Swiss-Prot record:
Keywords: Cell membrane, Cytochrome c-type biogenesis, Heme, Iron, Membrane, Metal-binding, Signal-anchor, Transmembrane, Transmembrane helix. It is a single-pass type II membrane protein. The chain crosses the membrane at residues 8-28. NCBIfam families: PRK13254.1-1. This is Cytochrome c-type biogenesis protein CcmE. The gene is ccmE. It comes from Wolbachia sp. subsp. Brugia malayi (strain TRS).
Length: 128
């Protein structure tokens, strides 16, 4: 085999190997990327039973606390959705603040949240 053919074969092998590595990295990242849908997008996915994340703002005067759960409305300023959550809310959770909820759609306008994340900007300062 000529030197030129060997170099071409080695270069092709390296190129193939690097493409395989990039493919596997992208496949793994696709499963772990944390994105969220807007409320309007989530309502169109109401038939979906897979866990999703929805991001939006908590509607003012919509938070209803009971012994077993918290119910509130979340909006993207276009549409609103009812969120039901059983658990302890994050300390930064408040009305008219940004939240991301993770869970499943119950019906067209109700979302059963398993986790609630309070969103904050880059100037976050924990409460003392």
């Amino acid at each position: 085999m000529k030197k030129k053919h060997k170099r071409l074969l080695v270069a092709s092998g390296i190129f193939f190997f690097l493409n395989c590595i990039v493919f596997f990295i992208l496949t793994i990242l696709r499963e772990n990327i944390s994105f969220f849908y807007t409320v309007s997008e989530a309502i169109t996915l109401s038939n979906n039973q897979k866990p999703i994340r929805i991001g939006g703002m908590v509607v003012e005067d919509s938070v209803i606390r009971s012994e077993s759960e918290v119910v509130f409305q979340m909006t993207d300023f276009n549409k609103s959705i009812v969120i039901k959550y059983q658990g302890i809310l994050p300390p930064m959770f408040s009305e008219k603040s940004g939240v991301v909820v993770q869970g499943k759609m119950f019906d067209g306008n109700t979302f059963l949240a398993e986790t609630v994340f309070a969103k904050h900007d880059e100037n976050y300062m924990p409460r003392k």
